[in-house]
Amino acid sequence: MSGPQQISILGATGSIGLSTLDVVARHPALYQVFALTGFSRLDELLALCIRHTPQYAVVPDQVVARKLQDDLAAAGLDTRVLVGEGGLCEVAADPRVDAVMAAIVGAAGLRPTLAAVEAGKKVLLANKEALVMSGALFMQAVRQNGAVLLPIDSEHNAIFQCLPGDFARGLGAVGVRRIMLTASGGPFRETPLEQLHNVTPEQACAHPVWSMGRKISVDSATMMNKGLELIEACWLFDARPDQVEVVIHPQSVIHSLVDYVDGSVLAQLGNPDMRTPIANALAWPARVDSGVAPLDLFRIGQLDFQAPDEERFPCLRLARQAAEAGGSAPAMLNAANEVAVAAFLDGRIRYLEIAGIIEEVLDHEPVTAVEGLEAVFAADAKARLLAGQWFERHGR
């Protein structure tokens, strides 16, 4: 490869996108921004375009596109503005692109991420919903198109680093007994259960360790985030649900562990900063400076672990059940969760009603086989419809 790698960043204005740009900016000889995309923080997208001078920017609609195009021209940039899902897929699959950071949150990220996979790109996967929803279809596309899939979630990136390079032969074949996903436990790990009824969106978004967007912060509080990561781990590493264990580790220093049959346990440690897994995936199989401070074990002093309480975190139980059921269940779980979390953030439901809505959706609809992408989106739409009916029945 000659010259810097060309990078498309899908979801550039989110926390993962901004962290990616921070790492990229540290290595101008290695990486160049090809495209930036944004959905809502469009003034910030303009500022990022001015700083990083991409060839393309992608926004949700034509009205916004015209304004951004005018603003870019006024700034002396010839960045071309594309629109909608078609624009996202175009910059993900462009032949000039070497790597795609897939950091769009939620189901909206599936098609463009799949477009990058089908184009055989190096895909840095931060959009866990893509794998949760489409699982077998997604991994089949990775294999068929020769894409390189590198996980960005700190936990899956840690597992990737702790596994041997030939883990695709099968976990049993390389001597792995189980995978241990660590979780901080979120802001309500020790909150008395009776107080959870009155949790506000602001409290749920105040994560004690990580800096994240609002939706993923709520998912972390309910531990649905860890449930989605459990499903993602099953697909990434060809693991059965019973081979993936969740461990609460409040310090978030150990990002995950791999337990081998000979009694060895390998762990990846580091300060809780998403630039570490981003730099690891960008440079893989090499390593580059991420800008993250070295880990000071003497300052940390102590590492704690505990089992998750399913009464406190029912979403984790629901996610494991969906993983075991397979088929349409994970897509429905994800869709119902997206609807419920959005309603909680809008003040329409209470925190503890999130899990109830998801469980009602999953209980209502039998699990069906998922033979193609249309079936994935049909399951997603059905779950959103059922969740919407919950609001109608409860006058919300």
From Swiss-Prot:
Pfam family membership, one = DXP_reductoisom
EC numbers? 1.1.1.267
Q: Please list the residues that bind Mn(2+).
A: 153, 155, 229
Q: In which pathway does it act?
A: Isoprenoid biosynthesis; isopentenyl diphosphate biosynthesis via DXP pathway; isopentenyl diphosphate from 1-deoxy-D-xylulose 5-phosphate: step 1/6
Highest taxon listed in the record's lineage:
Bacteria
Similarity field: Belongs to the DXR family.
Q: What is this protein called?
A: 1-deoxy-D-xylulose 5-phosphate reductoisomerase
Q: What organism is listed for this UniProt entry?
A: Pseudomonas syringae pv. syringae (strain B728a)
